[in-house]
Amino acid sequence: MAPEVLESRMNLENVESFKQTDVYSMALVLWEMTSRCNGVGEVKEYEPPFGSKVREHPCVESMKDNVLRDRGRPEIPSSWLNHQGIQMVCETLIECWDHDPEARLTAQCVVERFSELKHHDKLSGRSCSEEKIPEDGSVTTAK
């Protein structure tokens, strides 16, 4: 849940408020998708975004402690930051789950960034799925 929802400070009469919380949620889903991508190293057993910080079915108070008090967000492994394409995804995630809803990217901005990533990938002559990051963090390209 987005911080403003946990704090009960969301403006329910403003459609933009809903869009901002959706962007936060989208970032959590993108984090989950990235964590399951074999292009960023070995795919480990599934773990929810806050899995290492909260129990399996956390209560609202536990999420408030993690998201509001501790400003916790899902962990971004260093191997993701060593992958050129995934690094851009990580930067996008961080900007989408900003504590301040007004500071978050819009959904349109996320679309534009991903389009840019796709365009960059075409220019480089390879697809993101060809680039693998082994556990040691070095980058290799599949032939």
Residue ranges, per PLM feature:
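Conserved C-terminal C-lobe helix
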Residues: 82-97
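Regulatory extensions flanking the kinase catalytic core
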Residues: 102-143
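Charged catalytic carboxylate motif
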Residues: 25, 88, 109
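Alpha-helical recognition domains of nuclear gene-regulatory proteins
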Residues: 4-5, 29-33, 66, 92-96, ...
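Short, flexible/disordered secondary-structure transition segments
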Residues: 12-13, 40-45, 74, 78, ...
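Conserved C-lobe activation region of Hanks-type protein kinase-like domains
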Residues: 6-75
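Conserved C-lobe terminal segment of protein kinase catalytic domains
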Residues: 70, 94-103
